[in-house]
Amino acid sequence: MEYSTLIARLKTASESFENLEVQLADPDIANDPKKLESIARERSKLEPLVLDFNKLLDTDKEIEDSKNLLKENRNDKEMESLINEELITLEESKSELIQKTTIALLPKDPRDERSVMLEIRAGAGGNEACIWAGDLARMYERYGQKIGWSVKPVSASESDMGGFKELVISVKGDSVYSQLKFEAGVHRVQRVPATESQGRVHTSTATVAVMPEADPVEVKIDPTDLEVGTARSGGAGGQNVNKVETAIDLLHKPTGIRVFCTQERSQLQNRERAMEILRAKLYEIQLKEANAKERSQRLSQVGTGDRSEKIRTYNFKDNRTTDHRLGSNFSLEPILAGQLDEVINACIAQEQKRMMEDFNKGVN
């Protein structure tokens, strides 16, 4: 789109912002807490864009003034040089603001603000794959804690040799899905397992699924489609063994999805958790079906969420993490310590760049 089209869209956003401010001053809306909160949230989202739009307009005015000043000082070489330097700086600022506002206008994934259920499954590699699944779980736990998210395991199938055959983690906070969605796919590890006596490097995998939490309104579950069983939650023995059947074994008969939840202290809490996981899994199926046609047109987009997609290799011998979507390497130790900001931000930037190529061809 042309620069004039960008300005027109920004004007529309600015008008919407002004309208929201008028609504916030309305006494009737002030007496409706839910509506007030909704309008305030929308205003808050638009405010950074409107501020950048105003900066862009100011920059355009400064560029125009500088060009007029340049015409008036053509015989003054020193002044001409100073004005040209100022124009270069202003044009750079304008270019940055164009990019920033264009990104802000890109279509948003409505699920980006949601919390998620993070499912990690051991893949190829036997016991080592289970241990690797546990390592990934700790990596995400550290990342979430660093940001300030609530990270809590809600369902786990432990391996006899350590780690997990399968683990579901609830990650709650602001805009969790917008960042963790890039983690969906196959994570491959190359290292010498602790049980390997010959020092040979083994390759193992674990699959990560990132499922945005679904509202009960979005996913209708017929109670007659559920088969619910109970069991005693496991413990370390003695007083820690749960003598009451608090664990929930939930089967959704139409899909065959089974959820076993043991982490909470009561049967009711485990049932609620199991239903949360089931809703997230069913919601993921709905999204995949709804996006089947669209997906063929978005093969190049980062973070498709395809479980068969190998997204990253972690090489312990070389202390290297390779993200195959980015074609970039990162130091292994910080990544496993939960310092995922660099790689996730790079994925976000890549996605935005590709979306801009489609959405914003010809901005000048």
From Swiss-Prot:
- The keyword NAD belongs to this UniProt entry's keyword annotation: no
List the Gene3D superfamilies hit by this protein, alphabetically: 3.30.160.20, 3.30.70.1660, 6.10.140.1950
Instruction: List, alphabetically, the SMART domains matched.
Output: PCRF
Q: Which residues carry this modification: N5-methylglutamine?
A: 239
Report the principal subcellular site: cytoplasm
PROSITE patterns cross-referenced by the UniProt entry: RF_PROK_I
Q: Which InterPro entries match?
A: PCRF, Pep_chain_release_fac_I, Pep_chain_release_fac_I_sf, Prokaryotic/Mito_RF, RF-1
Q: Listed disulfide bonds for this chain? A: none
Compartments in which it is found: Cytoplasm
PTM info: Methylated by PrmC. Methylation increases the termination efficiency of RF1.
Has the keyword Cell inner membrane been applied to this entry?
no
Q: One GO term of the cellular component aspect?
A: cytoplasm
Instruction: List the molecular function annotations (GO) for this entry.
Output: translation release factor activity, codon specific
Q: Which residues cross the membrane?
A: none
Q: Which Pfam family, just one, is annotated for this protein?
A: RF-1
Q: NCBIfam families in the record, alphabetically?
A: prfA (TIGR00019), PRK00591.1 (NF001859)
- Functional summary from the UniProt entry: Peptide chain release factor 1 directs the termination of translation in response to the peptide chain termination codons UAG and UAA.
Name the family the entry cites: Belongs to the prokaryotic/mitochondrial release factor family.
Q: What is this protein called?
A: Peptide chain release factor 1
Where does this protein come from, organism-wise? Prochlorococcus marinus (strain MIT 9301)
What lineage, starting at the top, does this entry show? Bacteria, Bacillati, Cyanobacteriota, Cyanophyceae, Synechococcales
